[in-house]
Design a protein with these regions (language model features):
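PLD/PLD-like phosphodiesterase catalytic module centered on the HKD motif
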Residues: 1-165
Length: 165
């Protein structure tokens, strides 16, 4: 926590997407003016555990098991892995952008530690939470993959008939 407060006091923007509780208090003048904490509470217990560091378009991305809870960092081995492929970085950024824009399942933390749920706007796109959108994207990818696999089956059968009949 202290390192994030020091970063905020030095003018570094710190954005935290969390699942549940957070000991850091955002928006305290002179301490955490540059810290934003948003909790995403949807159908899934797990959260993305994506870490992005950088500014000015020079971002480094990591994925990992760590969720930065003190008891877990002190009593377990946690790992972060750098993401180096441009396409993977873009995918991670899309996930982060989706979560920051969530108007259904997102709760903004205030300096007193209380949370206030965001209210969806009239825009139909805000009616779905980020987790629901990610589920739809995964299902869409699965359908595309199944379609590609099923296209190959008749060709293989025809080829097999020609070779073995």
């Amino acid at each position: 926590c202290r390192a994030l407060y020091r970063a905020s006091m030095a003018g570094v923007k710190v954005d935290l997407l969390i699942r549940d509780t957070c000991r850091i208090r955002p928006g305290i003048a002179g301490l955490s003016d540059n810290i934003r904490v948003v909790s995403i509470v949807g159908n899934f217990l797990e959260h993305s555990r994506i870490y992005r560091f950088g500014a000015g378009g020079l971002n480094e991305y990591y994925i990992g098991s760590a969720d930065c809870m003190k008891r877990k960092l002190e009593n377990r081995v946690e790992a972060l892995v750098p993401v180096e492929e441009t396409a993977h970085k873009q995918e991670l950024q899309q996930i982060l952008d989706l979560q920051w824009a969530d108007q259904r399942d997102a709760w903004d933390m205030h300096s007193d530690g209380s949370y206030h749920q965001r209210i969806p706007t009239a825009d139909p796109a805000s009616a779905m939470g980020s987790q629901d959108v990610l589920v739809l994207r995964a299902r869409s990818r699965q359908l595309v993959a199944e379609k590609k696999r099923s296209r190959g089956v008749p060709f293989v059968r025809r080829l097999g008939r020609r070779l073995f009949l």
